Amino acid sequence: MTPLSETEKNLGKSKHSGGRRFMAKAVASISALATLAGGMALGAVTAPAAFAANGPTTSYDRTLGNAQFEAARESNGLSKEMDYGAILHAWMWSANTIKAHMDEIADAGYTSIQTVPISTIKGPVEGMQFTENWYYVYQPSGTGIGNKVIGTEQEIKEMTAEAHKHGIRVIADAVINHFTADWNAIQGDWKNSSFFHTRQEGGCGDNGTAINYSNRWQVTHCHLLSLWDLNTENQEVANRMKDYLTRAVADGIDGFRYDAAKHIELPNEFDRYSPYYDTILPNGAQYQYGEVLQGDQGLNAPAYPALLQVLDEWRR
């Protein structure tokens, strides 16, 4: 087994005593880095499992509904409910690195592992280290699976299968509000202007990027940090994103953390019904949570938990 890096050593270890496991301390504020979104916050939520191969079943079927998974989970003293267990935020870890240290992760008492976004992304600027462009993981170029950070789709499948052998579930960060700001980097099957809000649609200044956070229409229709804002009222866009999430679940993902969730309108928030959340959330995952930072005038924050649970970053 390869030695742990200094960052990975922060994982910590736990000890057994009388059959009880004392959890390693929970992941701290690393997750605050996890989004570029103009209201940075974390959202809470809800989650797949099998061993020989991950198939197109639900997360529950492959984990809590799987006798082998349950035996491993109970043996490692891990929480049955993901809400009550510690989550290891494996920030910028590859699937292979996570897989190589699964024994330590289980021994430390982590119920779940959260990965970086697993979709295809904009590549780093030529000549620059990827660590200087960490935010590219929040700039999808399409809805394929696999990128320079997490690794290939096959490596993700192997990592989730290994996690399930240890009774651990896997949450993937998911960017479902926008794509990269670089139109040329967007993959061909997504290069359709109807799939994105126009730069003028939200009524924002500065080519659609100057968002008034007291105006919910602008928050949900303008282009956050110039990122191409998905037309989430478009049923085909919703169907495509649902297909991506369902495929990720089939690859062994148990849950999702939805980046910039407050930048996506609620189903009946405006005059025109938005099918987005109603379409994408029934994807077979067991645990889903959204990033919703309170504080914006006009934000109906309590309405989001009706769709998925929300953990706020409270302003002090």
Question: What do these predicted ranges mean?
Answer:
Residues 1-23:
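Terminal targeting segments of Actinobacterial cell-envelope proteins
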Residues 21-40:
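Sec-dependent N-terminal signal peptides
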Residues 37-59:
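C-terminal region of N-terminal signal peptides and the immediate post-cleavage residues
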Residues 54-86, 97-110, 116-140, 155-172, ...:
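Active-site-proximal helices and loops of the catalytic beta/alpha 8
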Residues 81-85, 121-161, 192-229:
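Aromatic- and acidic-residue-enriched carbohydrate-binding clefts of CAZyme catalytic domains
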Residues 86-96, 226-239:
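Active-site mouth loops of central-metabolism enzymes
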Residues 148, 152, 233-237, 269, ...:
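Residue-level preference for long, well-ordered alpha-helices that form the structural scaffold
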Residues 183-192:
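Flexible, glycine-rich active-site loops centered on histidine and acidic residues
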